[in-house]
């Protein structure tokens, strides 16, 4: 990737550092989408010995890119995300991806297709880790944040 395009791409990814999720860290601050993506990628690496038949590189790529669309829309909690929200996020993400050079466009499109269909082992593991990380994070946060989490999306 050309240096200028790399910097542009990283600038979009940087937005995920400021995109907060609906849950809190154990220290009482809102978790970012970037932190969530980093942790499920680490989880993929740490459980890889349990799935020797899985392609670890593909799995880690899925974990890294799974929430890139939220760089454009922010995090909308799953329990509040509508079909219209999903379509908007997918459209904006696709528009951005089409500006990337090959082989990144094709590879990312294939990874997103696999993640959506959840037919491959890697896609099923990624989705399980995505859900598990959220459960772990909720359990690590103070119980007093639970009612706040429900109010956040209604503001």
Name what the model sees in each region.
Residues 2-5, 102-144:
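Histidine/acidic-rich helix-loop-helix segments that form or flank divalent-metal centers
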Residues 5-23:
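Short alpha-helical hairpin
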Residues 12-15, 39, 61, 128:
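Residue-level recognition of specific faces of alpha-helices
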Residues 27-37, 80-88, 123:
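Active-site metal-coordination segments of metallo-dependent hydrolases
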Residues 28-58:
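Alpha-helical phosphate/pyrophosphate-handling elements in metalloenzyme active cores
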Residues 53-65, 122-126:
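Alpha-helical scaffolds flanking conserved acidic
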Residues 55, 68-106:
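Helix-adjacent hinge/juxtasegments
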Residues 149-155:
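Conserved small/polar residues in nucleotide/adenosyl-binding loops
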């Amino acid at each position: 990737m050309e240096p200028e395009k790399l910097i542009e791409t990283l600038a979009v990814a940087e937005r995920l550092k400021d995109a907060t999720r609906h849950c809190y860290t154990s220290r009482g601050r809102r978790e970012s989408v970037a932190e969530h993506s980093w942790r499920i990628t680490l989880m993929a690496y740490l459980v890889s010995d349990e799935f020797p038949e899985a392609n670890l590189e593909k799995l880690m790529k899925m974990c890294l890119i799974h929430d890139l669309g939220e760089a454009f829309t922010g995090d909308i909690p799953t329990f509040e995300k509508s079909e219209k929200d999903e379509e908007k996020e997918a459209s904006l993400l696709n528009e951005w991806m089409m500006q990337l050079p090959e082989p990144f466009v094709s590879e990312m499109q294939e990874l997103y297709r696999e993640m959506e269909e959840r037919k491959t082992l890697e896609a099923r593991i990624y989705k399980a880790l995505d859900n598990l990380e959220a459960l772990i994070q909720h359990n690590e946060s103070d119980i007093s944040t639970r009612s706040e989490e429900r109010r956040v999306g209604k503001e």
